[in-house]
């Protein structure tokens, strides 16, 4: 059994991207092990998939029902909350502590890892001052980020999200991963390379520079393999590469809250000529996340909301209590209804009729004040020097479970001992998590 497990989350990677010529390092890893399509969880979004893999359980258990959460008690939506305590199931590092194996765990740039039981944690945590933002990362042990800062430079949050998001984020994270691998020698190391995610959302699944981006990500994998070789652990190391989801090409958004407002379900408060959502008095609203929307409905309005959803072009499915159970998303945090878009659509959070009445944060990179995920933050309008309000700019999305023949995420390893099912079958993300826990 391997003494070191290195798990690399390469967002958006698919089986068709892997070849000896284009991605030789990833290809070589697969040659002594296996390559499998992944059966991901619903919704196929970052926080949900990561929690499912790390805990070996479904959202109905761990409670991370999307990248955002809605607090019904104080009518508040929050996206990208980092606290580990939000995950309601034991993850790999918790199991390590319970079993007392002495294994050391490290996790870099995964979601919901602040204050976790992992021995080593690194995650972006910018500090918002009155006049500026301090680019900082939370680290455990304290001082780890400061050591990295001295060795490889600061982590710039604009590389990680927004109009300037780029492969620089993946490159910095890889360098940090090398540092942790060499200096801490963890038994379990989880790291994250995000830059394909930006490219697919901006450009769709078949953009011109995709080969360059794949070669770049493959070079990063090669650097980690080389580092494991140089520090003498390669013979006792299992590499696992996986992706959280595949992308579909999209051509426009569906502004569910605007439609709900047209049907007098959404209430707003106008303050200084700006319209803000009033969730206290709204009969229903949608917390949107890519191609999935959790819809929270006041009592006695479920049937009318469902009827409205059924009439919206581009809405593929509406999940009620029974279908939520079938997809293992029946958790108290979930919406009363869940809408799923067609493959060529995604849900935007917009609620205004007149863009001039939209809040100032709508035209900024502001991941915490918007009641939904906003991929348009990847774009910039030079004429207004702000984030545009045009959902048609987005060309790729995810979140829905793939239908037959659609693209799926991929699992690659240099070991072949995960084959608990027929090798022709897809490998469940939950099965991967249970497998990892059994390696302890």
Each PLM stretch: what is its role?
Residues 4-6, 187-190, 238, 336:
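Residue-level preference for the first positions of well-ordered beta-strands
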Residues 6-7, 25, 216-261, 265-266, ...:
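Metal-dependent active-site segment of extracytoplasmic phospho-/sulfohydrolases and closely related
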Residues 8-12, 31-36, 46-51, 68-81, ...:
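Glycine-/proline-rich flexible loop or hinge segments
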Residues 18-61, 104-106:
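Short, structured active-site-proximal loop/turn typified by the sulfatase FGly-forming signature C/S-X-P-X-R
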Residues 22-25, 121-125, 204-208, 253-260, ...:
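Short secondary-structure boundary/capping segments
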Residues 46-48, 234, 255, 260, ...:
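Short, solvent-exposed loop/turn segments at the edges of secondary structure
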Residues 57-204, 216, 287, 294-297, ...:
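His/Asp/Glu-rich, glycine-adjacent segments
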Residues 89, 277-435:
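Active-site neighborhoods of enzymes that stabilize oxyanions during catalysis
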């Amino acid at each position: 059994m391997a003494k070191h497990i290195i798990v690399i989350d390469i967002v958006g990677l698919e089986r068709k991207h892997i070849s000896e010529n284009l991605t030789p390092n990833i290809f070589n890893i697969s040659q002594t092990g296996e390559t499998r399509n992944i059966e991901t969880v619903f919704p196929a979004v970052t926080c949900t998939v990561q929690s499912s893999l790390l805990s070996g359980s479904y959202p109905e258990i761990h409670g991370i029902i999307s990248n955002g959460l809605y607090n019904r008690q104080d009518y508040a939506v929050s996206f990208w909350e980092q606290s580990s305590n939000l995950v309601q199931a034991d993850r790999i590092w918790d199991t390590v502590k319970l079993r007392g194996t002495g294994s050391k765990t490290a996790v870099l740039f995964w979601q919901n890892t602040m204050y976790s039981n992992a021995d080593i944690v690194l995650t972006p945590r910018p500090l918002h001052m009155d006049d500026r933002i301090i680019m900082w990362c939370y680290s455990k042990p304290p001082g780890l980020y400061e050591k990295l800062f001295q060795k490889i430079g600061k982590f710039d949050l604009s590389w990680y999200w927004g109009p300037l998001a780029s492969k620089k984020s993946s490159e910095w994270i890889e360098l940090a991963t090398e540092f942790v691998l060499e200096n801490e020698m963890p038994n379990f190391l989880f790291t994250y390379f995000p830059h394909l995610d930006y490219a697919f959302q901006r450009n769709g699944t078949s953009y011109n520079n995709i080969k360059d981006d794949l070669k770049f990500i493959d070079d990063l994998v090669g650097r980690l393999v080389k580092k494991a070789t140089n520090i003498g652990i390669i013979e006792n190391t299992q590499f696992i590469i996986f992706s959280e989801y595949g992308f579909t090409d999209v051509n426009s958004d569906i502004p569910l809250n605007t439609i709900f407002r047209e049907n007098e379900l959404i209430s707003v408060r106008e303050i200084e000529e700006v319209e803000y959502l009033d969730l206290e008095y709204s009969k229903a609203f949608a917390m949107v996340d890519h191609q999935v929307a959790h819809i929270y409905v006041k009592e006695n309005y479920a049937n009318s909301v469902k009827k409205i959803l059924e009439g919206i072009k581009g809405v593929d499915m509406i999940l009620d209590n029974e279908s939520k159970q079938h997809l293992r998303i029946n958790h108290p945090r979930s919406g009363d209804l869940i809408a799923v878009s067609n493959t060529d659509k995604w849900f935007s959070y917009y609620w205004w009729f007149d863009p001039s009445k939209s809040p100032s944060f709508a035209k900024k990179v502001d991941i915490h004040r918007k009641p939904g995920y906003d991929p348009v933050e990847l774009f910039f309008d030079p004429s207004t020097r702000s984030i545009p309000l045009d959902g048609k700019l987005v060309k790729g999305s995810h979140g829905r479970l793939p239908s037959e023949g659609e693209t799926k995420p991929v699992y690659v390893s240099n070991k072949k001992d995960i084959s608990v099912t027929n090798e022709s079958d897809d490998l469940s993300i939950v099965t991967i998590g249970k497998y990892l826990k059994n390696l302890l």
